[in-house]
């Protein structure tokens, strides 16, 4: 008898029902294109997220790390920025707000062990949702994606140590060394 690999893809509604029923209370997970991905926060990752929240400009915006419903996925970006006066345009279940992509000014993933999916799957996910700017922060550089398209982003710029990265929504730039 041979063994066959079984795979199961979650629907967004099915995942939300399970989430709201407490099925994942003892785990940090996110739903990405029908698959449940674990969310692991190590020391460097946690410190880098703290730096983002400390250094990103806050005038006229809200910084959060709430789940960001995106298409048929429920990613948990490490940080995202929305207009302070933005209102949700819908919801997924009773606890997750859906936002207009034009109100989401920056999405950030801090990548230690997740660089490949953050630069591939999540780049495609956030770009196709229409979020204007997406950063992937690693220990050595920040990848800035802009110009969202149906398959990702038109432009990717890498910023390394010693560089400054523009924060477009605020008209300022930050030292990469301070963020990584």
Task: Please name every model-derived segment.
Residues 1-180:
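Gly/Pro/Ser/Thr-rich low-complexity, intrinsically disordered segments predominantly at protein N-termini
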